[in-house]
Amino acid sequence: MNYCSQCGGPVALTVPPDDERPRYVCPACGTVHYQNPKLVVGCIPVWEERILMCRRAIEPRRGYWTLPAGFLENGETVAAGARRETFEETGSRVVDLVPYLMVDIVYIHQIYLMYRCRLQAPDFHPTRESSEVKLVTEAEIPWDAIAFTVIEKTLHHYLQDRSAGSFSFRTDRIDAPPTAA
């Protein structure tokens, strides 16, 4: 950040009075610019024990597999955002959303909130964001081509809970980027 969104003056990275973290502060008007984590919302859509996954058609990680998820928009509820992202990435409608997993991705300042849900019908198709969309069994999950660590964790938690026959709300965290193999 270089300039104040209130007055247009240059900002300085400094610790404001009565604070403990460096923030962008405008010396001209005194505005403190807080930068907070971004919320990513998504779904684990299921139809007859199969999970709907999509192959990314956009960067980052084009060509890798993921669950439908994306950034929450202003003025949108968390569940509505998860539904919208699922529709945008798969062309499908989901029902019976239940909050399932929250993952803090500390190093990139993101928080993921994933819902368990059902497909309203087995209707889905590729979209601008997904080059391929398909239902997969546990054995068909492309583990060697998962786009993001958070998606891998989500799938592992989900499959573990499904196998145990019991779901509860979970939390997890990712502190650092994956290391190259």
Predicted feature residues:
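Conserved hydrophobic/aromatic beta-strand scaffold that supports enzyme active sites
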Residues: 3, 23, 44, 53, ...
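Nucleotide phosphate-binding site architecture
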Residues: 5, 12, 27, 52, ...
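Short connector loops at helix/strand junctions that flank enzyme active sites
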Residues: 21, 36-40, 46, 60-62, ...
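Conserved Nudix-box catalytic region and its N-terminal flanking loop in Nudix hydrolases
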Residues: 46-88
